[in-house]
A protein has these predicted regions:
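C-terminal catalytic histidine-bearing segment of alpha/beta-hydrolase fold enzymes
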Residues: 249-297
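N-terminal cap/lid segment of alpha/beta-hydrolase-fold proteins
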Residues: 30-83
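Short beta-strand/loop motif that positions the catalytic acidic residue
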Residues: 227-229
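Short amphipathic alpha-helix adjacent to the substrate-entry channel of hydrolases
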Residues: 101-120, 245-246
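Primarily recognizes the serine-hydrolase "nucleophile elbow" in alpha/beta-hydrolase
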Residues: 142-222
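Catalytic nucleophile-loop/oxyanion-hole region of alpha/beta-hydrolase
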Residues: 100-101, 107, 125-159, 271-277
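Short beta-strand element of the alpha/beta-hydrolase
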Residues: 84-93
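Conserved alpha/beta-hydrolase "acid-adjacent" motif
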Residues: 234-242
Length: 297
């Protein structure tokens, strides 16, 4: 009897250990997010470039990405119960030479997904990285435009309303988001690739301490804008963003501007953020609600 009991105990222990392993694997899988290439067969302008992107980890544990040859989006979806149908393509900053994907990418997308908004972190090609042959207009902007189209093409799969796909950009990523909000098209109905038949116009734009291009055109055709920066940021941003707000207002584009006293550049979404700046994502969400983009359909 003792041997039988010992055997039963051993088998029970094995079953428990197996279940724990299964639960652990499920937890790991749930914590991993799908990465989707913008062009599965290779990005135009990156022919023959198959090297993997490089990842540098800072002393603070931040992940910084360089050498992006095949641009992609990392997908963060809300639960079905939370999903509002709204979606944001997020462009991290890094001076067009690198991508700070944590506090200006993954953390943002995760927060949004937990509040019912699908987040897609864009890894775009870098125009100012040492030795780069890419340009902002020729590669980085098309990466953003393709990402918008791609999200729309998989809207049903991802629980997204194709009419509520917007863009958000931080610093250099804000440059790209701002360009995407002014340079767009309805798609090419004759394109061989179904993705290219869809519109690249974002439904809204969120520019977070953006490095604005000096020649950015402003027109009444732009989508609604959420603008945000710190008062202590460099003049091109802390003065340039309010100037853009005035231009948008004169053009008849709905816009909201937030300038935070005593705040500089690069705050993003961090657990270390304190004071008023820690609540900026909530203000963005409130703005989305105000313009009617969080209403479930």
């Amino acid at each position: 009897m003792e041997n039988i009991r010992e055997s039963e105990i051993k088998h029970s222990a094995i079953r428990v250990a197996t279940l724990l392993c299964v639960f652990a694997l499920v937890a790991v899988a749930a914590d991993q997010n799908v990465v989707v290439l913008l062009w599965p067969n290779g990005a135009p302008g990156s022919e023959g470039k198959t090297a993997l992107e490089k990842v540098r980890i800072t002393p603070d544990g931040e992940h910084v990405i360089t050498s992006v040859y095949q641009p992609s989006i990392t997908v963060y979806l809300p639960s079905r119960e939370m999903a509002t149908g709204a979606a944001v393509v997020i462009a991290p900053g890094g001076g067009h030479a690198e991508l700070w994907v944590d506090h200006e990418g993954y953390a943002v997308a995760k927060w949004l997904s937990e509040h019912g908004v699908a987040g897609f972190v864009l890894k775009y090609r870098l125009a100012r990285e040492a030795g780069s042959t890419y340009t902002i207009e020729g590669n980085s902007l098309p990466d953003m435009q393709r990402a918008i189209r791609l999200v729309r093409s998989r809207a049903a799969e991802w629980g997204v309303d194709p009419q509520r796909v917007g863009v958000m950009g931080f610093s250099a990523g804000g440059d790209i988001a701002a360009r995407a909000a002014t340079q767009f098209d309805a798609g090419d109905s004759a394109a061989a690739d179904p993705v290219d038949r869809l519109s690249s116009k974002p439904a809204f734009q969120a520019l977070i301490y953006p490095g604005l291009p000096p020649d950015l055109p402003v027109s009444r055709d732009e989508p609604p804008a959420f603008l945000l920066c710190g008062a202590d940021d460099r003049a091109g941003i802390s003065e340039g963003l309010p100037a853009l707000f005035i231009q948008l207002k004169h053009a008849g584009v709905p816009a909201e501007l937030h300038v935070y006293a005593g705040v500089g550049h690069g705050f993003g979404v961090r657990s270390a953020n304190t004071g008023a700046i820690a609540g900026w994502p909530d203000q963005f969400l409130e703005w989305l609600s105000t313009i009617g983009f969080l209403k479930r359909k």
